[in-house]
Amino acid sequence: AYRWFLRMGLTEKVPDASTLSQNRLRRFNDSEVFQQIFDHIVGQALANGMANGRVLYTDSTHLKADANPRKAVNELRPEGVSEYLEQLNAAVEADRKKHEKKPLPAVKNKPESEAAVKNTKVSTTDPESGFMHRDNKPQGFFYLDHRTVDGKHGIIVDTHVTPGNVHDSQPYIGRLERQIQRFGLEPVAAGVDAGYVTAAVCHLTQEMGVALVPGYRRPNKGQNVYQKKHFTYDPERDVYTCPAERLLTYGTTDRNGYRHYRSDARVCVECPLRDNCTKNKKGEKTLTRHVWEEAKEKANALRLTKWGKKIYARRKETVERSFADAKQHHGHRYARFRGLMKV
């Protein structure tokens, strides 16, 4: 069968096994041939109606790195920079201008030795893997496979590997843009789990004309009885109203894209609900609202519609099934090689 596949005659000499393996290991290093083959297969699926790119489902799964979790060192590594920093900076400046605030001073480009760093656990066996520490997930060195499948028949249209300590939302927009540009897709909806629900992802998907249908995540309960959900936002006046019918007015917009709304401490001191509202020593209540919070609210509202529920329900039949098949039948639980490129 392999002679027929390789178009070899019955008497021709078969290449040695090492010839094939070394070709795979050396010849195509630093090339995009594997990506090109993958893209060609996806193109064939689209051309033959097996996929249509109308609804895309994205999720990530962890692959255990070939690395002993006990063989690790702590290193000071540069802090990760958001993939959406440029768009966020523009939105922050526009919002401050709208509220007649001075522009924020430009961030100075510090030399590498003075850049912001954080203490990071690094494997001595596979330094390119990432130490994963998530709720209800195993702890150790892992890689993440960020996968997107088509909603029609579950055809994989994109896969992207990162270290295990990369947040799901970071590569999402870049990968979605690549799929749209590479294959000419026109998606109307994208189904994702709660890990992708950030203000940036919600805003940028809506800017692309894609309806984001997210999962639900129970918010962390703070120390106060009255949470943010008990305060009502008025977009016309740009104020929050507290349970005691008092106003929290706009103060400023910080570099991270959050507007700060503060109450009048003189009013809060005499409020009978104060003990359930804030523990601030000044008697002042502060709420934050992202400049792209409206997009996040729209995504959550869409999740509750009949159409949104129907779209989200198919995640388990598409991307979750794809991961289950990969793990159960194709050894996708463990990374057989070391290093990001080989994984």
Q: What is the predicted role of each segment?
A:
Residues 1-5:
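DNA-recognition alpha helix
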Residues 7-343:
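Anion-binding and metal-coordination hotspots
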